[in-house]
């Protein structure tokens, strides 16, 4: 009986250790949380989410020409050549897991150029509402999603929009770099923030 109890205790101890290791392993991959408190959602996790419901991914535009010493693509209010390369690389990785999506951008040169290089030929719809970064952006997202309820959506917008959404939805301080993104979805007329997109 004593031997059985010892064996049982050892089994429980090993089980707890395994659970802890599994949790640590998970935190090293797609299950990790960012230091800002947002869940980190990588490409594979995003693809799994998209199988459950259509996702809305909002990206900050690529590197601005007027705030960089790198070569401009063309217009000074647009993005740099490096920005185009970064956007194309991100788009290729994203499309490998989420090939089917509708593409939108705000009506600025830098977001339009970023979306164009990201998509590699996909039709782009420019919507000036995506420049508005208060509660209005939720109305715009819901409207876009209602036009094609079963489609994933990619939106190119601005850092202050992403910062506002993270704070408003999860009380998180999010200071996005170029091409950083947030993952959202619409359910029963409400917009939910799932986490921060991490390109892996």
UniProtKB/Swiss-Prot annotation:
It comes from the Bacteria. Keywords: Hydrolase, Periplasm, Signal. Coiled coil: none annotated. Pfam families: His_Phos_1. Residues 1-25 form the signal peptide. Its main location: periplasm. InterPro entries: His_Pase_superF_clade-1, His_PPase_superfam, LipoPS_heptP_Pase. Its EC number is 3.1.3.-. GO terms for cellular component: periplasmic space. One of its GO terms (biological process) is lipopolysaccharide metabolic process. It is found in: Periplasm. One of its GO terms (molecular function) is phosphatase activity. Pathway: Bacterial outer membrane biogenesis; lipopolysaccharide metabolism. It is an enzyme of class 3 (hydrolase). Gene3D superfamilies: Phosphoglycerate mutase-like. HAMAP family: Ais (MF_01868). Catalyzes the dephosphorylation of heptose(II) of the outer membrane lipopolysaccharide core. NCBIfam families: PRK15416.1 (NF011945). Belongs to the phosphoglycerate mutase family. Ais subfamily. This is Lipopolysaccharide core heptose(II)-phosphate phosphatase. The lineage of its organism: Bacteria, Pseudomonadati, Pseudomonadota, Gammaproteobacteria, Enterobacterales.
């Amino acid at each position: 009986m004593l031997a059985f109890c010892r064996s049982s205790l050892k089994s429980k101890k090993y089980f707890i250790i395994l659970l802890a290791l599994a949790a640590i392993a998970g935190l090293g991959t797609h299950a990790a949380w960012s230091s800002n408190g947002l869940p980190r959602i990588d490409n594979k996790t995003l693809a799994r989410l998209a199988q459950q419901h259509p996702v809305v991914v909002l990206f900050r535009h690529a590197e601005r020409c007027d705030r960089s010493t790198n070569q401009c693509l063309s217009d000074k209010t647009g993005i740099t050549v490096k920005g185009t390369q970064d956007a194309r690389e991100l788009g290729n990785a994203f499309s490998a897991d989420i090939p089917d999506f509708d593409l939108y951008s705000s009506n600025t040169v830098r977001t339009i150029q970023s979306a164009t290089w990201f998509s590699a030929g996909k039709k782009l719809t420019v919507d000036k509402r995506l420049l508005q970064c208060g509660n209005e952006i939720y109305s715009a997202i819901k409207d876009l999603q209602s036009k094609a309820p079963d489609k994933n959506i990619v939106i190119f917008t601005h850092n202050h929009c992403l910062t506002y959404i993270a704070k408003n939805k999860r009380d998180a301080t999010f200071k996005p770099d170029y091409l950083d993104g947030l993952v959202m979805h619409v359910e029963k007329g409400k917009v939910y923030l799932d986490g921060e997109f991490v390109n892996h």
